[in-house]
Amino acid sequence: MSAQTGWDAFATHALREEDLPAVLEIWLSANLQAHDFIPEKYWRENLPMVRQMLPQAQVLVCEAEGKIVGFSGIDNGHIEGIFVDAPMRSRGIGKALLNEWKRRFPILTLCVYEKNKSALAFYLREGFSKVRLQQDEVTGEMGYMMQWSGVKQ
């Protein structure tokens, strides 16, 4: 898939082994920035587990000018996250990744922390609805279970 961000083209592909270092760097930095209400230690301690799990997951990687600028993972229609490199945010990359999942799945779900206001606003703009507010068992933070349906009623 290719798309135009307004100033340069980007393309998506399935995660490759050689993508892992850049993807993990984006995962860590994006989580630290978006979730400053969760201790940094939590994200750093989870990095090895993420490193192990990513190659087995369904992951879409986004590149611009040969550089990885974002990625998203999904499990049976549940979006595990959309992560975009900080300098590339607000250029349509997250939307393009989300649109690819919308193209592939008739129903999407995800969880987003209540305090992550920018992500919450993004998903609401993209047609997701809040299903319920729940507490994350690990972090103790409140988050919304959200759903999008492309099924025509």
What are these regions (language model features)?
Residues K95-A96, K115-G143:
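Conserved active-site alpha-helix within GNAT-family acetyltransferase domains
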Residues M1-E18, K152-Q153:
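Conserved N-terminal entry element of GNAT/NAT acetyltransferase domains
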Residues M49-V61, H78:
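A short helix-loop-beta-strand connector motif used in the catalytic cores of GNAT acetyltransferases and
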Residues H78-R89, V112-Y113:
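A short, internal acetyl-CoA/4′-phosphopantetheine-binding micro-motif in the GNAT/acyltransferase core
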Residues R103-K115:
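Conserved GNAT acetyl-CoA-binding A-motif
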Residues Q58-G70:
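Conserved beta-hairpin
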Residues V84, S90-R103, A121-R125:
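Conserved acetyl-CoA-binding loop-helix of GNAT-fold acetyltransferases
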Residues L20, L24-V50:
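Conserved GNAT-fold acetyl-CoA-binding loop/helix
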